[in-house]
Amino acid sequence: MIVVNKEDCIRCGACQGTCPTAAIEVTPEDVIYCDICGGEPKCVDACPTGALKIEDLVVDEAGNTQGRIVFNPDKCNECGDCVEVCPPQILKLDEGKVKKIPLQGFCVMCQKCVDICPVGVIGVEGIKEPAKVELEIEGPIFIADCVGCGMCVPECPVDAITLEKVGGVIEIDEDTCIKCGVCAQTCPWNAVYISGKKPEKRAKEIRKFELDEEACIGCNTCVEACPGDFIVPKSSNLTVELPAICTACGLCEQLCPVDAIDLDVELGPAKPASEEGLVWDEGKCDFIGACANICPNDAIRVVTREGMKLPDNEKVDEEPSFAMCTRCGACTMACPKGALSLVDMDKVIDGEVVKRKRVQYNPALCDQCGDCIEACPYDMLKLTDEKVPLKGFCILCDQCIPACPKGALSLK
C-alpha cells in the first residue's frame, strides 16, 4: 500500500494531479489517500455486487507483491455502500454524471504518485520508505535550500525579503521582519522557517498554467530550472509538457526566454501565526464563530461550516476558516502618520503579570490612506464610516476567550 510522510510533505499536490483514480487529495492541512485499509479494504467487503475486489500486483523485479483495488463498473449499481464505509472518505460517486467509471478514490497501485513526488515523501510499504527531512532549524529566521522563485517576496507585509536574482537565494532583513510567518506559509518548497516552526501551508489554486507551443523554442530552460522535475521535454515538436498540478513556484515562467509560459496562481489567506498574547488552537476550533460575533473591533473573521462569514453575516461559498489580527505590527510600520502603534499592556497569565502587545489606534492622526489595509498579512483591516474609521485590529480585550465553547482561544 501507499504510505505518505505527511509531516515533510510540501503540499504541492503533484500526486493528486497525476493519480488516475483520484485516490489522493492534498489540502494545506492534510494528505488524504486510499491505503486499502492496510490490505483489508472495507469497500470491497461492503460492495453487494462484487464490483470491487482486491488482487495482488507484482511491484518490483524481486517479485514482491502489493494489494490493489480493482473496480468493475459493469457490476456497480452506484448504491454508495463503499463510500459510506471508506475510513479516509476518499471514495466518491460521480452521481448524475455520464462517466464510464462512476467511482473514484480507490488505489490501483500504479505508483505514479511515488514517481512524481518532488521530495520523495511517498513510498510503498515494505518496498520503498518515504523520505524524511532532517533539519536543524537555527535561529528565528532559517532558510534552507531556497530555489529563488521569489514567491514570498511580494507577500511580505513589511518588505523585509529581497531576491537579487531569480534562481538565487532570498535574504530576510532580521531588523525589519516581524515574524508573522507569511513567507513560510507561502513558500512552495518549505525553504523558510520562522520562529523555529514547520509552517502550515496556505491554500493555493492554479487558475491558469498554459504553454504557447508556437512561441516555445524547445530550449528546455524550464525543464532544467524546475526544482521538482515536473516539466517534460517533447523533442518531437520542440516543446515541453507542463504538469497538471505542481508547486506553482513560477520559476519556469520567470526564466522562459520567450515568455511561452503563462501561470496564474491565487493564494488563500495566511493563517494566524502567534505564540504570545491571544493564541488560536486550530485543533480545538469548530468554526462556530461566537468569537467573531463578540469581538468589539471585528478583529476576528470566521467562515462557519454552514458557509456564513462572521461577523458580516454574509453567505459565502468558502471552506470553514478562521482569521484574526495577531498584533504582528505590520500595520503600525506601514502607517505614515503614526496613527497605529504597538503598546504593552499588563496581562495575568498563570497567576503572573506579564507584558503583552496590543494595537493602539489614534483616529485623530489617521488620514484614511489605506496603507495599513494593504500591509495586513491576514486581510483583517477595513475602513468604515463610523467615528472610529478603522476596524480589524486587536485591542487584546479578551472577550473572545470565554465566548469560545471549545476553548480554542487562550492567552499565552
Curated annotation (Swiss-Prot):
Recorded hits in CDD domains, A to Z, give: MtMvhB_like (cd10549)
Record flagged with keyword Ribonucleoprotein: no
Which cofactors must be present for this protein to function? [4Fe-4S] cluster
Keyword list, A-Z: 4Fe-4S, Electron transport, Iron, Iron-sulfur, Metal-binding, Repeat, Transport
Q: Does the keyword Electron transport apply?
A: yes
According to the UniProt entry, its GO molecular function terms are: 4 iron, 4 sulfur cluster binding; electron transfer activity; iron ion binding; oxidoreductase activity
Q: Which InterPro entries match?
A: 3Fe4S_ferredoxin, 4Fe4S_Fe-S-bd, 4Fe4S_Fe_S_CS, Fe-S_Ferredoxin
Chain sites annotated for binding [4Fe-4S] cluster = 9, 12, 15, 19, 76, 79, 82, 86, 107, 110, 113, 117, 146, 149, 152, 156, 177, 180, 183, 187, 216, 219, 222, 226, 246, 249, 252, 256, 325, 328, 331, 335, 366, 369, 372, 376, 394, 397, 400, 404
Sequence ranges assigned to domain 4Fe-4S ferredoxin-type in this UniProt record: 1-29, 30-57, 67-96, 97-127, 138-166, 168-197, 207-236, 238-266, 276-305, 314-345, 357-386, 385-412
What detail does the entry give on cofactor binding? Binds 12 [4Fe-4S] clusters.
Q: What is the protein's given name?
A: Polyferredoxin protein MvhB
Species whose genome carries this gene: Methanothermobacter marburgensis (strain ATCC BAA-927 / DSM 2133 / JCM 14651 / NBRC 100331 / OCM 82 / Marburg) (Methanobacterium thermoautotrophicum)
